[in-house]
């Protein structure tokens, strides 16, 4: 459906503009240390993870997938890990604490174990 595809494209573009604004706000607040190309790349990479995470779970863990709260939380962890590489020294302890709270082992071929 061409109309649905166009509406989704507009939605995706709005989301990425808003996400870029959030990341730019983190830069201005001194939470993340990034230049504009890095903000753009992080925005795009975060969008890719957020929109592909459920599909990843289904293809990695089989047709039933693992859509538990833990595995959805792990998707948030993946994005936070990308962001953490740009964290300022002042923000790093809070980000690391949040990473520890969100981390869930995958128990999949990605981490070398079998399900």
Residue ranges and their predicted role:
Residues 4, 35-39, 64-68, 72:
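Residue-level recognition of alpha-helical structural elements
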Residues 55-115:
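C-terminal peripheral helix-coil segments that are non-catalytic and often amphipathic
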Residues 3-29, 40-55, 73-81:
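Amphipathic alpha-helical packing segments from all-alpha helical-bundle domains
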């Amino acid at each position: 459906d061409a109309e649905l595809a166009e509406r989704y494209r507009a939605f995706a573009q709005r989301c990425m503009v808003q996400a870029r604004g959030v990341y730019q706000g983190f830069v201005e607040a001194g939470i993340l240390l990034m230049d504009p190309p890095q903000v753009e790349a992080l925005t795009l990479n975060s969008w890719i993870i957020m929109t592909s995470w459920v599909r990843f779970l289904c293809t990695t863990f089989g047709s039933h997938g693992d859509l538990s709260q833990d595995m959805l939380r792990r998707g948030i962890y993946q994005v936070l890990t990308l962001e953490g590489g740009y964290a300022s020294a002042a923000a790093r302890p809070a980000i690391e604490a949040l990473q520890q709270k969100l981390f869930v082992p995958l128990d999949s071929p990605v981490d070398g174990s079998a399900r």
